């Protein structure tokens, strides 16, 4: 579909930009993301984002999806059964921390 082609092009553009410029604020630092994940996320989402019980698997998810979800929770929007907890966990995160988390989780294939 046209939408899928647009999204694929956007994703390739983001990846290309990151490879060319390695800007941590846009691309994320995997090591910093791993440290933040261990501190904030691992107890519910499991080791390396594998998912536990009612907490979804995050491992290998696309970066734009992860950033969108964390930004949505950070804004206080409820989008799932664990929204209250996720809002509380996401609100203190900076844009850089969100990018780092997304980079780490995406790298867990």
Segments (PLM) and residue ranges:
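Short, Lys/Arg-enriched N-terminal segments with co-localized hydrophobic residues
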Residues: 1-7
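Predominantly soluble domains enriched in secretory-pathway, periplasmic, or organellar proteins
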Residues: 8-10, 31, 67-68, 107-108
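Sec-dependent signal peptide hydrophobic core
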Residues: 10-16
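N-terminal signal peptide c-region/cleavage motif recognized by signal peptidases
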Residues: 22-23
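Sequence/structural segment immediately N-terminal to covalent heme-attachment motifs in c-type
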Residues: 28-50
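Sequence context surrounding c-type heme c attachment/ligation sites in exported
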Residues: 31-39, 59-68
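Axial heme c-ligation environment in periplasmic c-type cytochrome domains
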Residues: 52-59, 74-109
């Amino acid at each position: 579909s046209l939408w899928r082609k647009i999204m694929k092009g956007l994703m390739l553009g983001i990846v290309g930009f990151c490879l060319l410029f390695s800007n941590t604020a846009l691309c994320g630092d995997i090591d910093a993301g791993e440290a933040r994940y261990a501190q904030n996320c691992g107890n519910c989402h499991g080791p390396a984002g594998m998912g536990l019980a009612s907490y979804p698997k995050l491992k290998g998810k696309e970066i734009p999806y992860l950033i969108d979800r964390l930004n949505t929770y950070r804004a206080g929007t409820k989008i799932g059964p664990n929204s209250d907890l996720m809002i509380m966990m996401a609100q203190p995160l900076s844009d850089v921390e969100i990018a780092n988390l997304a980079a780490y989780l995406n790298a867990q294939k």
